[in-house]
Curated annotation (Swiss-Prot):
This is Urease accessory protein UreG. The gene is ureG. The lineage of its organism: Bacteria, Pseudomonadati, Pseudomonadota, Gammaproteobacteria, Alteromonadales. It holds the Pfam family cobW. Homodimer. UreD, UreF and UreG form a complex that acts as a GTP-hydrolysis-dependent molecular chaperone, activating the urease apoprotein by helping to assemble the nickel containing metallocenter of UreC. The UreE protein probably delivers the nickel. Coiled coil: none annotated. It comes from the Bacteria.
């Protein structure tokens, strides 16, 4: 059976920014509409893959956890072979896949996805790290296709200004889109889905 062309969506961001929570919400919202799968990257465990399975985000055979060992950004940039093999495996299992989400291991602001691994890149940062994060720059913040500023509900608790983050993000990204989000309440989720569907030419 001939496999259809597959959209690959990279999801990057620092540890704890909310990447796995975003994946879970995207799976729950889109799994009945699209044929989809997920590849997660963890340094020594399959924790993120297990989280998605436990939360019934997708059927178990649609999720593969890659143990990257050592440096997580090597697996998404310099040597993407493990991730490409995982995508191929999922595509063999599900020849009609519309897209696969590839979650990077927790990385720093300089990590980027190899073009052969990701057609569309989402980068997640979170407000709890402070409102200075957007102006620190780095490829994830300046060059990702969509920047997601997550956990806006904790802004007051950590003394972060969303206005400052909005201003600095516009300065760093120019015309590139970004969205403020709170995955607990699904705030911003509709905009993220619309971006994926539009830019990924799914609709």
């Amino acid at each position: 059976m001939r496999k259809k062309q597959l959209l690959r969506i990279g999801v990057g961001g620092p540890v704890g920014s909310g990447k796995t929570a975003l994946l879970s919400q995207l799976c729950l919202a889109l799994r009945d509409k699209y044929d989809m799968a997920v590849v997660t990257n963890d340094i020594y465990t399959h924790e993120d893959a297990q989280f998605l399975t436990r939360n019934n985000a997708l059927a178990e055979d649609r999720i593969i956890g890659v143990e990257t060992g050592g440096c997580p950004h090597t697996a998404i940039r310099e040597d993407a072979s493990m991730n490409l093999a995982a995508i191929d495996d999922l595509h063999e299992r599900h020849p009609n896949l519309d897209f696969v989400l590839v979650e990077s291991g927790g990385d720093n602001l300089s990590a980027t996805f190899s073009p052969e691994l990701s057609d569309l890149t989402l980068y997640v940062i979170d407000v709890s790290a402070g409102d200075k994060i957007p102006r620190k720059g780095g490829p994830g913040i300046t060059k990702s296709d969509l920047l997601i500023i997550n956990k806006i509900d904790v802004a007051d608790l950590v003394g972060a200004s969303l206005e400052v983050m909005d201003r600095d993000t516009k300065k760093m990204r120019g015309d590139r889109p970004f969205v403020f989000s709170n995955m607990k309440t699904q705030q911003g989720l509709a905009e993220i889905i619309d971006f994926i569907e539009t830019e990924g030419m799914l609709k």
